[in-house]
Amino acid sequence: MLKYPDYLSKLISLLRKLPGIGFKTAEKLAFELLDWDQDQLEAMGQAFSEVSAARSHCSTCFCLKNLPESNCEFCQNNRDTSTLCIVATPKDIFSLERSQIFKGHYYVLGTLLSPITGKHIDVERIGLLKQRIEFLKPQEIILALDATLEGDATALFLKQELAFSSASISRLALGLPIGLSFDYVDSGTLARAFSGRNPY
């Protein structure tokens, strides 16, 4: 029976926890890491340790930020207050920033609603979103969510929750195939989807 050394088995097992990484890919990556020299491995280990110690979220929009600042660079910069873009994860913000089409403010929900798994958005996070809207008083709220069942459910939920605001609500449309996550959309397609957003 095939049996790897314990350290290699543990590494493969940990790599498989990453989304989209199956056994074969994890095995390939693990063997690649075995060829790295000591300095490279130590640098990788240090990077993981720094992520664990320094991981922090903006107190305003919940994007990632550097310590010890309380706000991220997007909330510190002088951005357009007339638009607020709501996304599911911090990664979505960086995807949109690469498209260089949006100059307004962001807000991270933390997750999408899932009618299948029962996953829900934190009540406090929604309350803080409402406070953010009342403070900014944006003219438009953009729902930049995945074109999936979870994205649709979340958009419908937000439309109901944000009915108190006079801001128009729109959602990305053109260029985003049904069922596709932001993770697989290039910046050009995302830019077109942003430009072609529709009232929601």
UniProtKB/Swiss-Prot annotation:
<feature type="zinc finger region" description="C4-type">
    <location>
        <begin position="58"/>
        <end position="75"/>
    </location>
</feature>
<keyword id="KW-0479">Metal-binding</keyword>
<comment type="function">
    <text>May play a role in DNA repair. It seems to be involved in an RecBC-independent recombinational process of DNA repair. It may act with RecF and RecO.</text>
</comment>
<protein>
    <recommendedName>
        <fullName>Recombination protein RecR</fullName>
    </recommendedName>
</protein>
<dbReference type="GO" id="GO:0003677">
    <property type="term" value="F:DNA binding"/>
</dbReference>
<keyword id="KW-0233">DNA recombination</keyword>
<dbReference type="InterPro" id="IPR034137">
    <property type="entry name" value="TOPRIM_RecR"/>
</dbReference>
<keyword id="KW-0234">DNA repair</keyword>
<keyword id="KW-0863">Zinc-finger</keyword>
<keyword id="KW-0862">Zinc</keyword>
<keyword id="KW-0227">DNA damage</keyword>
<dbReference type="Pfam" id="PF13662">
    <property type="entry name" value="Toprim_4"/>
</dbReference>
<dbReference type="GO" id="GO:0006310">
    <property type="term" value="P:DNA recombination"/>
</dbReference>
<dbReference type="Pfam" id="PF21176">
    <property type="entry name" value="RecR_HhH"/>
</dbReference>
<dbReference type="InterPro" id="IPR000093">
    <property type="entry name" value="DNA_Rcmb_RecR"/>
</dbReference>
<dbReference type="GO" id="GO:0008270">
    <property type="term" value="F:zinc ion binding"/>
</dbReference>
<dbReference type="GO" id="GO:0006281">
    <property type="term" value="P:DNA repair"/>
</dbReference>
<dbReference type="InterPro" id="IPR023627">
    <property type="entry name" value="Rcmb_RecR"/>
</dbReference>
<dbReference type="InterPro" id="IPR006171">
    <property type="entry name" value="TOPRIM_dom"/>
</dbReference>
<feature type="domain" description="Toprim">
    <location>
        <begin position="82"/>
        <end position="177"/>
    </location>
</feature>
<comment type="similarity">
    <text>Belongs to the RecR family.</text>
</comment>
<dbReference type="Pfam" id="PF21175">
    <property type="entry name" value="RecR_C"/>
</dbReference>
